[in-house]
């Protein structure tokens, strides 16, 4: 898998998986690559969130599968967020296989526990952050997630006596509603708002009676 990503990076192929390939290789080599820069965010902003803020990996994987299984398993490029979710799931699957192989070949239970805890605290946390970020961008909108991260970063760095008691909450609804059409296609449209039509003002002057024509009296 890493050979595939390595070829993409060295060949500078302009494809949607280019950034995700640099992400996977960055984790492998320890390079200072921030995969959130192209989305207007950063590792630093995500690290302001506490560790227990991010849901469990199984819950995130189940959510991604339930909402976007068709897009993730298809061959079409839907968005950079879908591509990042794909690569995060692939990286975590490879790490899970590595842990399973180590568990079956290492006899010491203490060593196995240390390895599993280390993977969960390092790579596992990065996958949790990545899945949460991109799922939230697809659910609430990228701009809303950016504002939330900045607001939370300001709140957590402000001394307790000078900040509100409650932290910001990511609760804003998305700007565009995604509607699934027949045949699997999706269309996004903004919610319509009905504006009341102005009522016609009735004239205050008395109504004039129509004068009958002379021919009507004949």
Swiss-Prot record:
- Identify the stretch(es) annotated as Disordered: 180-218
InterPro entries the record matches: Hepatitis_B_virus_capsid_N (IPR013195), Hepatitis_core (IPR002006), Viral_capsid_core_dom_sf_HBV (IPR036459)
Localization recorded for this chain is:
Secreted; Host nucleus
Q: Which UniProt keywords apply?
A: Disulfide bond, Host nucleus, Host-virus interaction, Repeat, Secreted, Signal, Viral immunoevasion
Kindly indicate whether the keyword Repeat belongs to this entry. Answer: yes
One Gene Ontology CC term in the entry: extracellular region
| Residue ranges, compositional bias (Basic residues) | 180-211
Q: Main subcellular localization, coarse class?
A: secreted
The record's similarity note reads: Belongs to the orthohepadnavirus precore antigen family.
Q: How does it assemble?
A: Homodimerizes.
Provide the function of this protein.
May regulate immune response to the intracellular capsid in acting as a T-cell tolerogen, by having an immunoregulatory effect which prevents destruction of infected cells by cytotoxic T-cells. This immune regulation may predispose to chronicity during perinatal infections and prevent severe liver injury during adult infections.
Instruction: Indicate what this protein is called per its UniProt record.
Output: External core antigen
